Amino acid sequence: MSESKGYQVNKQILAATTLSVGATSGIGSIASQPRITRWYARLRKPSYVPPNGVFPVAWTTLYADIAVTSATAIDRLRAAGRDKEARNYVVALAANLILNAGWSWLFFKYQKLGASAIGAAVLAASSADLARRAAAADPRAGAALVPYPLWCVFATVMSAHIWLLNRR
């Protein structure tokens, strides 16, 4: 993700972003325990919703991407003396990860379909902002992060459609 072939991201920064993303994944997964998945199976869903097995693969890939690209962006910003931008990136990442885990709680745990559709839209906007910030630090990191907001837009469409199909 850099112009030089020998670039290695700062291991401490990578460890911090990996732990943060891992915590997000864990907190989000608590909300979707087996009892909740039975509820999800009973929901009316549009035909384009992927099979359940796609979601853990997609999210594991996206979480790894978020950790690596965010570490790269933060490291690049700090190395360039752009400390304020690095701090702002960390704040934006933290907010994004809170929104990310929060969606699972809104949708699965609290079964608030309308609120989760709105939450997904806010997460998509936050994810696009994160990709923009990453691109400002390192264009390749920004490009590598683009699948995240795209998936979040897809999740927004799915969430909204599920909400519409299941309104009472």
What does each model-found stretch correspond to?
Residues 1-168:
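Short amphipathic, positively biased membrane-proximal segments
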